[in-house]
Amino acid sequence: MRRLLATTMMLLMTTAALAGCAGSDVTQDDVDAAYDNGYAAGTADAASVSTLDTIIARGALKCGVKDSQFGMGYLNADGTYSGLDIEYCKAVAAAIGIDSIEYILATGSNRFELLASAEIDVLIRTTTWTTSRDAGLNADFAGMNFYDGQGMLVNLDQFTEATSALDLDGANICVGIGTTTEGNLLDYYELHNMQMTTINTENAAAAQENFLDGSCGVWTGDMSAMVARMWGLRDEGMNLAIMPELLSKEPLGAATRDNDDDWNDVVAWVWYGMITAEEFGIDGSNYGDFVNSENPGINRLLNSNLGLGTDANPLSDTWMQAVLGAVGNYYDAYDRSFCDGDGEMANCLINRAGTLNALVSEGGIQYAPPMR
């Protein structure tokens, strides 16, 4: 929290300096107090060092993730993590030549504080890119690895006739604290002149407990999460259904701290590289066949630094080969996260075909800017 306050103070001080004679609520006493407490100096020092350089010096990447959503961020019984967000973390680590990853649990309510205080290097935790988060939380968003929308999981024993979200008037609804889901839910119910009671929960475990004991008859969150929850509750003997409506747009992606452009560029272009590789038909098993390609686009992808990194720690020319060796392309990562992982996109918890998460060439919106 101190680091968060320090960052805020530094931004206010900078604003005051730029404002000059226009005036400011920040006084010289505030500035002196900040330096006396070490806030401003510490923030200034931190701002001058790229997170990438810090990671390389440390020898480990600290990735803020979920641990309870199958398909995105999930802690398995054997202690390993899996999911599309985890694949993204692994890809970033491979790109910068780091073997060690520390997965740090980030909740809906503390994730941006963890990021601002530098307790994590990057947040990859089903986090929706919104205006207020981008502008107000000093977060800089990078690659969007999953396009989602808000769904509603319903206990049909409480709502026996429900076939639509419009049938859920008067519901007790479990919703995560500190999520865009809260605001979307309020907007939807107000728009349709419906009544509901929110049961705010700190995490998925608390929400599931309330859902199982009947405290809430509806559980709302990202549709990907609701599908995963329904799958996880398949042996509970409950009569469940997901309503067909999507209450919102939820572009989920990675976030770094503001004013850390070199690091943000790396995080973003790792994702774009995975998409570009799939577009070229290059995956985790065949990329070696393309390293001497005469195709200029492929050659740049597999054998060029592309200006990424810092002066002290530029990415290697073969950084994308390292990514492909670690996690493969976007198709590979999705297949392992949501499907059987056999390379055929079979038996998927959430199909990619026909959704926004398909490549543009296949009717979706996953698309990479030119890598040149």
Identify the role of each PLM range.
Residues A94-A95, L156-F159, N172, T179, ...:
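Extended ligand-binding regions for polar small-molecule ligands
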Residues G38, G42-R58:
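Bacterial Sec-exported substrate-binding components of ABC uptake systems
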Residues K62-G71, G79-A95, D148-A206:
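Bilobed "Venus flytrap"/periplasmic-binding protein-like clamshell domains
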Residues V92, L115-A116, L168, A207-L212, ...:
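Hydrophobic residues within well-ordered alpha-helices
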Residues M1-D45:
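Secretory targeting signatures
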Residues K90, A94, I101-D167, S224-L246, ...:
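Acidic, polar ligand-binding/catalytic clefts
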Residues L308-R372:
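C-terminal functional modules
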Residues V49, I56-R125, Y330, L359:
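Extracytoplasmic small-molecule ligand-binding "clamshell" domains
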